[in-house]
Amino acid sequence: MTRLGLVVAEFNRSVTERMEAAAREAAADADAAITDTVHVPGAYDSPLAADRLARRDDIDAVAVVGAIVTGDTDHDHVIASATADTLTDVSLERDTPVTFGVSGPGMSGAEARERVEKGAAAVESAVSLTQEL
């Protein structure tokens, strides 16, 4: 059984709570266990939580979910890029799969609500990588 850590960004909570539910359902379908869940303020805050989970012996992989909605500036692009880069660093430094189930950037709130399946996809990828590696 794959043991997962789950990081959930709270910003845009109406979307991310549905992403979390999709992630939990995907874990159950894959016969994986979510060992621990860490809620963080926003996607940008997720790398530290992912790193702490990836250090643990009782976690095989970490799935991160969040939603980055566009605003009046390019801030969403900056946040998404920095988050993706840093989560990749965590995965490589810890030799642990850290999957990116963060929707955005460049999407509206309505588009974010249509993409809650990224929560399930993050878990499915984490399980797949754990089994493959």
Swiss-Prot record:
It catalyses: (2S)-2-hydroxy-3-oxobutyl phosphate + 5-amino-6-(D-ribitylamino)uracil = 6,7-dimethyl-8-(1-D-ribityl)lumazine + phosphate + 2 H2O + H(+). One of its GO terms (molecular function) is 6,7-dimethyl-8-ribityllumazine synthase activity. Pfam families: DMRL_synthase. GO terms for cellular component: cytoplasm; riboflavin synthase complex. The keyword Transferase applies. 5-amino-6-(D-ribitylamino)uracil binds at F11, A43, Y44, D45, A67, I68, V69, F100. The active site is at H75. It is an enzyme of class 2 (transferase). One of its GO terms (biological process) is riboflavin biosynthetic process. InterPro entries: LS (IPR034964), LS/RS (IPR002180), LS/RS_sf (IPR036467). Catalyzes the formation of 6,7-dimethyl-8-ribityllumazine by condensation of 5-amino-6-(D-ribitylamino)uracil with 3,4-dihydroxy-2-butanone 4-phosphate. This is the penultimate step in the biosynthesis of riboflavin. Belongs to the DMRL synthase family. This is 6,7-dimethyl-8-ribityllumazine synthase. It comes from Halobacterium salinarum (strain ATCC 700922 / JCM 11081 / NRC-1) (Halobacterium halobium). The lineage of its organism: Archaea, Methanobacteriati, Methanobacteriota, Stenosarchaea group, Halobacteria. The gene is ribH.
